[in-house]
Amino acid sequence: KTKMSSYKSVPTEFTIEEALDTTEISDLRDEMQEWVDNMSGTGLENTNKYQMAEEAVSQLENVDSINFDEIWDELPDDGLISADELMAVKFTSNLYTPKSRKQHPSRAYRLSNAITHITDALQEMRDYIEDKLGAKEMPEEVKSLMSAIGDIESQIQELDNVEFPGMFS
């Protein structure tokens, strides 16, 4: 990661539905795949950079197995909490953005921001559901929902170990 000092933290408001978005992660995977394709068949194929890019692609590919519908499918239409209600819950995530407008955020920061807003959204769902239930017994479908949230959370956390090759390394 680049030095923190060139980035600032910006509170960003999301609805849960907006935050449960893996587009940025898929874009990063595609960018790394492009690197791999461009280096294939060249002398760069045996470099550390090639291996790192390849490794990043294979880790980021796990994003395809993340399916937020698994969460929404757990919610019955007539249940305690509706999917629409949950999707509309607003919260704030602190995302990092370069201090200089000329600078694009690094891949590591783009990934980190995506992981942050998805993880925050999952936590926000948990809190919302627990508040809504209060002291009531947790119904089966809510237990399944919590377990679906936990599964997705672990999948997202695995993406936190992805390392991107530097332009010049």
Q: Residue locations for each model-derived region?
A:
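Long, low-complexity or tandemly repetitive, helically biased scaffold regions used
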Residues: 2-24, 31-169
